[in-house]
Regions:
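A conserved structural/catalytic subdomain of Rossmann-like adenosyl-cofactor enzymes
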Residues: 31, 35-251
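S-adenosyl-L-methionine
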Residues: 1-36
């Protein structure tokens, strides 16, 4: 079904069938592309899907350098490893994933640390609003991966775009203005109050390679300060008014 929907989507967008190749298969279990490398990859894989995590993959070039495989019940990082392997020397990749990949421990922590510390391919983490996609209401994040980081090798950009959307009847919608704001923040690559932060590798390491966005982008809105003297005066005034009313009601 997904295969046919993908083909229909291309045709409806006016792309001739001779100009695209769509294959239906399990890309983790059977790597159709072999050693082929790509300059650009975009993916929205099934979130926290099951996969075999067979030990044979420890000899697979896509996974063996990490020393760990993604858990059987959460193939998220397996898709990331697959994409990183197929990036060419100037390759870029963008992948949508659940937020759990940013902070879950055990094998996923090992893989995350390797991507950051050894390969240094993670360029940005972007948090999106909840309920953007059919079939799931969970908020997702975008991982931007780049083989050549062009002067940004000592930092990772975090963007919290989770509050910018238009609420729809069945799902939320990213407006063009919301998309433009994300793109502008990514291109500027600087701290923006309550929206974006450029985290140094030292910060990342001090946080134990935990990439949970609230650790880096503070969106906390302080509560309005309460003037206790003013509150006390209001209470005294009310008490006086109540006393006057009681006096009027007495026979």
């Amino acid at each position: 079904t997904t295969y046919n929907l993908a083909r229909m989507n291309m045709i409806l967008r006016g792309i001739p069938y001779r100009n695209f190749n769509i294959y239906n298969g399990d890309t983790l279990e059977h790597d159709y592309f072999g050693d082929k490398k790509f300059r650009v990859q975009v993916a929205n894989p099934p979130y926290s899907a099951n996969w075999s995590a067979d030990m044979k993959f420890m000899e697979d070039a896509r996974f063996n350098e990490y020393g760990k495989l993604a858990p059987k019940s959460k193939a998220d990082f397996a898709f990331v490893q697959h994409m990183v392997y197929h990036m060419d020397e100037d390759g870029r990749a963008v992948v949508l994933l659940p937020h759990g990949v940013l902070f879950r421990g055990a094998a996923e922590e090992v893989i995350r640390k390797h991507l950051i510390q050894k390969l240094n391919v993670l360029d940005a983490v972007i948090g999106l609003p909840a309920n953007l996609f059919f079939g799931t209401g969970i908020p997702v994040c975008v991982l931007v991966l780049k083989r050549e980081r062009n002067g940004n090798a000592d930092n990772i950009l975090f963007i919290d775009a989770s509050k910018d959307f238009e609420a729809g009847k069945n799902q939320n919608i990213l407006r063009q203005s919301d998309i433009d704001k994300i793109v502008d923040a990514y291109q500027r690559r600087e701290d923006i109050d309550k929206y974006a932060h450029v985290a140094t590798m030292q910060e990342i390491e001090e946080n134990g390679f935990n990439l949970n966005i609230p650790r880096y982008v503070d969106t906390f809105e302080p509560e309005e300060e309460i003037d206790l003297n003013e509150v006390a005066a209001d209470i005294r005034k009310l008490q006086s008014e109540i006393k006057d009313i009681d006096a009027e009601l007495k026979p």
